[in-house]
Regions:
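Zn2+-dependent peptidoglycan hydrolase active-site motif and core
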Residues: 88-152, 177-178, 182
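Short, compositionally biased
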Residues: 175-197
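Surface-exposed, glycine-biased beta-strand/turn segments
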Residues: 29-121, 158-164, 170, 200-201, ...
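Short alpha-helix capping/helix-loop boundary micro-motifs
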Residues: 77-80, 149-153
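Surface-exposed, short loops/turns at beta-strand junctions within beta-sandwich domains
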Residues: 2-7
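Short, solvent-exposed loop/turn segments at the edges of extracellular beta-sandwich modules
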Residues: 14-21
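Hydrophobic beta-strand segments within extracellular beta-sandwich modules
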Residues: 9-11
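Conserved binding-pocket/active-site segment within a compact domain
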Residues: 161-169, 186-193
Length: 240
């Protein structure tokens, strides 16, 4: 089944002589080969940035910046919440979440998270902290939002690179303006965070064009309270 695979096969052989039995176990490693439309080189694989311009981004949070959060973020100027969010590559919407989240104001606002499967097996990405979705997607969420961030299955919808997903990000009340972003590669073809809990969380910079990747790297910030090993997804600055 697409997206489900194993990297080894274990064979057990039981041999009995009367009531005396012994079991021999052999483990065979399996070469993993991804199916689908996968390039030889993923550099610049994403056709566009998730916002209309990378110049809007003021700072970048790397993957696995927090112990319980695999993705990073792209932050923009305070109060600049009304921004379009677009798909970086052709993909299929698979799961999502809608929940109430208190911002720094203490007032809860609705936040959305969307998860997509690419046409290359094993490569998935998520876009989070969306405030206003396009109708085609928002209509898929039929229950009232709660503080439960549980991810739910959604009817699979296919989108093309550049398709509009949302028209607002972050928290409007306090002006906290950012969009969450993370890529997972089950085949570990790109550099990953090396974090055991999120071993397949990819350092997503290289998926964008070299110019965009360079700009994002120059804006990457590791906060001192974030227990992330520097050099995994190379930061350029560290702030208190």
């Amino acid at each position: 089944e697409w997206g489900h695979f194993f990297d080894e096969i274990q064979v057990q052989l039981e041999e009995c002589n009367g009531s005396d039995c012994s079991v021999a176990t052999t483990t065979l490693e399996v070469e993993l080969l991804a199916r689908g439309d996968c390039p030889e080189d993923f550099t610049g694989w994403f056709k566009n940035f998730v916002l209309d311009s990378v110049d809007l981004v003021t700072d970048v949070g790397p993957p696995v910046r927090l112990p319980n959060e695999a993705g990073g973020y792209f932050r923009v100027t305070q109060g600049q919440n009304d921004l379009d969010v677009r798909l970086p590559i052709d993909a299929t919407l698979t799961t999502g979440s809608r929940f109430l989240h208190p911002g720094t104001s203490g007032v809860s606002e609705i936040q959305y998270g969307l998860d997509f499967r690419t046409k290359c097996e094993g490569l998935r990405f998520g876009i989070g902290h969306l405030a206003d979705l396009v109708d085609e997607i928002s209509e898929l969420f039929t229950t009232e939002p709660t503080e439960d961030t549980k991810v739910v299955d959604l009817p699979p919808l296919e989108f093309q690179a550049g398709d509009l997903l949302a028209t607002a990000i972050g928290f409007r009340i306090d002006g906290n303006s950012f969009v969450g972003f993370g890529v997972n590669d089950d085949f570990l073809r790109m550099p990953t965070s090396k974090e055991p809990l999120f071993h397949n969380a990819v350092c997503y910079y290289g998926f964008f064009s070299p110019d965009i990747a360079s700009d994002l790297l120059s804006k990457t910030v590791h906060q001192t309270y974030e227990p992330v090993e520097e050099g995994v997804c190379p930061p350029t600055t560290t702030t208190p």
